[in-house]
Each structure stands twice: as structure tokens, then as C-alpha cells.
Amino acid sequence: MIEADRLISAASNQPEDVVDRAIRPKLLEEYIGQPQVRSQMEIFIQAAKLRGEALDHLLIFGPPGLGKTTLANIVANEMGVNLRTTSGPVLEKAGDLAAMLTNLEPHDVLFIDEIHRLSPVVEEVLYPAMEDYQLDIMIGEGPAARSIKIDLPPFTLIGATTRAGSLTSPLRDRFGIVQRLEFYQVPDLQYIVGRSARFMGLELSDEGAFEVAKRSRGTPRIANRLLRRVRDFAEVKHDGTISLDVAAQALDMLNVDAEGFDYMDRKLLLAILDKFFGGPVGLDNLAAAIGEERETIEDVLEPYLIQQGFLQRTPRGRMATVRAWNHFGITPPEMP
């Protein structure tokens, strides 16, 4: 099953991104959740502006859908500079990165999404650019090859990744600021859902907003996606007003349960409970049992289940927790 096909996927979706961009906060004072990140960034940005310097290079990591791109936009807005956006897979050659860097104005922000997917050749170009604001490029080939240095204006590189562990140490060490985004609390998501509903002109009760937030897996992108689908249900099946009952009916119809689990989450947990008696089970066996790639399990399915206390990673494999047994109303087998 492809991650982008899941309703509760946190993967980016192009048509939705257009709407999401319009309702994203533009400044730190509008930024909801992540209190530690917000308070730290307020200080770092104010200090850089007082000194008249570019902000230190910033690495943002965490699960998808938590607002890494939003935070990059906010930083550029707060600094009053331009934001140039690209992604790791797009920068195939050193020249691609060099072209972007040489077009930056002083203190501009260059945002590289999925920075862990940069090729080694491109990454090598980044090192002197980040440290010394210089490009060191080889011209020509063979005996005639020569190195030229190009001075760059001071700039801020913001890298975003869902896999901080995949970054090389030399790249990771060149970021002066590192911020981890955590899953959102339900009250913060409720506020985000309410704000989005006002932007979309919807009648949404506080209880309805809470129900959508509760099932959004701690992720604003999922919350906004669920809100749009609940809106569709409310307009077709009811009078367009989203109450607690309407939200619950819509989300039940969409097969998103009270914990925010969809079919794939339940399939994974039930496989561990039913086929492997709660575990431990190795990742390869689990992948074969549910017909998924091991990378999909590690990067997409597991993080939220572990964070919510339904799944454990142990040296011997994956294990379901007591909370998982209770969620499905299954009695754990007696230990021998």
C-alpha cells in the first residue's frame, strides 16, 4: 500500500498543499505548538537581527507533516529576507546547487527539504559554502582541471529531514541550530483545526474540532486533511455544520478510529498480536506478514505507534504493548 494513498498519511499532497500554504502561519506569534522550538527561535532570530547577521544554519527534523516547511517560511519572514526552496533529490549535480547559491541575496534563506537525500558530490559543495560562504568548484577535466573559488553572500541554510540519522556527520556538524519537531498535543491541534475551519468558512463546534484533532495522529497536515473530508461528509449528509456527532460519523466512515489508526495501523498491530502472539518479531518477518516494505514499517507506520505506546522496538524485535492488547480487547496469552 502506497503511503500517499492513506487518508492519514503525513506525506505531502500537491493539491492540498495549495490550500495548506494559504492557512499556514506566517510569523512566530501565529505559530501554534512546539513551545520550546518557538521560544528558542524567537531568541536566535532577534539576536541575528540585532547584530545585522544572517541567522545560523538551521536543521529541522522530525516526522512528516509537523511543519518543517512552515517553520522555514516563518524564519524567512521574521528575518525579512527571501526564501529559496529546493529538495535533496532535485539537486543532482554540483552545478545545480552552485546556481542556487550564487543567486542568493545577503541573509537570504535557502531551504533544502529531504536534505538527507543529497548526493555526496553536492554535499561536498555545501561544506565550504556553509562554513566560509565560498564555492569551491572544479572547472575542466583531467590535467587541465582547476579549482576556482567564488565568494557568496552570508546566507542561512535550512535543512529539513525526517531521517536525521541518515545525515553524514560532517554535514550535521555544520548546522549551528538543530530543532526537533514533536507530535502535537490535542489542544494545539484543536486550535489549528478551528483556525483552518474559519479560513474555509465552516461552521465547526468546539467538540467537532476536538474529535478531528483527537484522530489526527498529532500531525497538523493530517488534521487539515481530515477536516476537509469531514466537511465533504457534513455538506452531503447533513446541513454543512460540523458537530461532534457529524465529525465522529464522518471519521468512522473514513475508517479512522479514536486513536487515529487506519487499516494499515490495525493490520500491523493485529499481525503482531495474532500471528506472533504479541512478539517479539523481527522486522523482515513482520514485513512479510503484512505485505509491506520494511522501510515503510520503519519510517511510516512505527513512529506514531511507538510514540503512543502501542509498540516497542526491542533487541529481539517488535513487541506489542499492554495498551495494544487492550485497544483490540484481546487477552494476552499466559506466559509459560
Curated annotation (Swiss-Prot):
Gene3D superfamilies: 1.10.8.60, P-loop containing nucleotide triphosphate hydrolases, Winged helix-like DNA-binding domain superfamily/Winged helix DNA-binding domain
Residues annotated as transmembrane: none
Positions bound to DNA: 294, 313, 318
A GO molecular-function descriptor: ATP hydrolysis activity
Keyword annotations from UniProtKB, A to Z: ATP-binding, Cytoplasm, DNA damage, DNA recombination, DNA repair, DNA-binding, Hydrolase, Nucleotide-binding
Binding site for ATP: 23-24, 65, 68-70, 131-133, 174, 184, 221
InterPro entries with a match to the protein in the record: AAA+_ATPase (IPR003593), AAA_lid_4 (IPR041445), DNA_helicase_Holl-junc_RuvB (IPR004605), P-loop_NTPase (IPR027417), RuvB-like_N (IPR008824), RuvB_C (IPR008823), WH-like_DNA-bd_sf (IPR036388), WH_DNA-bd_sf (IPR036390)
HAMAP family: DNA_HJ_migration_RuvB
This protein's name: Holliday junction branch migration complex subunit RuvB
Organism lineage string: Bacteria, Pseudomonadati, Pseudomonadota, Gammaproteobacteria, Enterobacterales
